[in-house]
Amino acid sequence: MSEHVYNLVKKHHSVRKFKNKPLSEDVVKKLVEAGQSASTSSFLQAYSIIGIDDEKIKENLREVSGQPYVVENGYLFVFVIDYYRHHLVDQHAETDMENAYGSTEGLLVGAIDAALVAENIAVTAEDMGYGIVFLGSLRNDVERVREILDLPDYVFPVFGMAVGEPADDENGAAKPRLPFDHVFHHNKYHADKETQYAQMADYDQTISEYYNQRTNGNRKETWSQQIEMFLGNKARLDMLEQLQKSGLIQR
């Protein structure tokens, strides 16, 4: 039995430095088609993909993101929850469909659809020899992103993805993930605090050693310290407001 896909995904790491070589239209089309083949809840296909190669648009999005590789890449994708087409169907429907696509469940369906599509594209791109990095930073200013991309109601930007050939001096590596026994619960969830704390303590040590070796001692923080810093930072607290402005999560 071939383990090609297993070995490919196990090597995944974010690439943040790319060669100045744009993806061809053929490659972009193949990536999007691979994304479209992902599973979709109830065949709703509640997503769209916006492909961006316009340098001005990239620069505008970089201002939102604050990350140079939003501009410096082979191609930029933005993944959106998309119920605009469903809204158009609703205009001629005998039932009130907005109760569904404006619901919290509708939001979850769209976000999951977009994520599944994006992961298909990521794996396909890596199989082609490209590197990728996801860009949640586009949510730093959702209103501005909606303006830049001319998004109508019922469409919400979830994240972006930069794709391209890794630069010759790109030296990223796969980070150690949480232990198998910590994320895989057999038959039911195991919430024993002592076990959870012990597993996280071991993982903290693993991550601290990883950073220490990767940076020649310049970084030694643990995973728990990273989580405390990230979740303690009161950022993007306007998501509910922005979702509702888009016509989503009305109930």
Swiss-Prot record:
Keywords: Flavoprotein, FMN, NADP, Oxidoreductase. SUPFAM superfamilies: FMN-dependent nitroreductase-like. It is an enzyme of class 1 (oxidoreductase). It comes from the Bacteria. InterPro entries: Flavin_OxRdtase_Frp, Nitroreductase, Nitroreductase-like. The keyword Metal-binding does not apply. One of its GO terms (molecular function) is oxidoreductase activity. CDD domains: NfsA-like. Its EC number is 1.6.-.-. Its cofactor is FMN. Reduces FMN, organic nitro compounds and disulfide DTNB. Involved in maintenance of the cellular redox state and the disulfide stress response. Belongs to the flavin oxidoreductase frp family. This is NADPH-dependent oxidoreductase. The lineage of its organism: Bacteria, Bacillati, Bacillota, Bacilli, Bacillales. The gene is nfrA.
